[in-house]
Amino acid sequence: DENEWLDVEKLPMFDIEYLFIKIRAVSVGETVKLNLTCQEEQCNGTGEVTVNLDDIQCTKPTGVEPKIMITDELGVVLRYPDWNLMEGVQKIDSNQQPIEMLKACITEIFDSESVYDADDISKKELSEFVDNLTFPQIEKLGEYFDDMPKVFYDASYKCNTCGKEQSRTLEGLQSFF
């Protein structure tokens, strides 16, 4: 329905970052100047790069599906983290952030006989489920998040100290402001 409002807080983080960059480009200006550190080991210099915000792109997922089998019989369905989730995760201990994000992004757990909606599972049961995952299983689930779209820009610059031409891919909103 065209009269429905878009709930920004439910958009995936990468969509919000992309929208923010586009709004910033229109409201304040299309370019931002950044000083990037030299990548040479013995150099402490920097290089300036002017980023045209209209040139920032969003990576496309390479095909890691949200439905992931963690054993032959057991699987989960994941979703991308949204604004509310990322805001909440920032408030907890950094060591716990990845696990808490994983718990919050599980939408379903299923086996060969049943599908369990995460909203119908208690927090305690969900915590026990995630706590019992092996490291290889957690790594497999992590591939979904590693494949998540990201805003990025390929920057080229010259160090003002050693003069070396360099390039670096900037990722995530924090890279641009």
Each language-model region and where it sits:
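Long C-terminal interaction/binding lobes of large macromolecular proteins
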Residues: 1-177
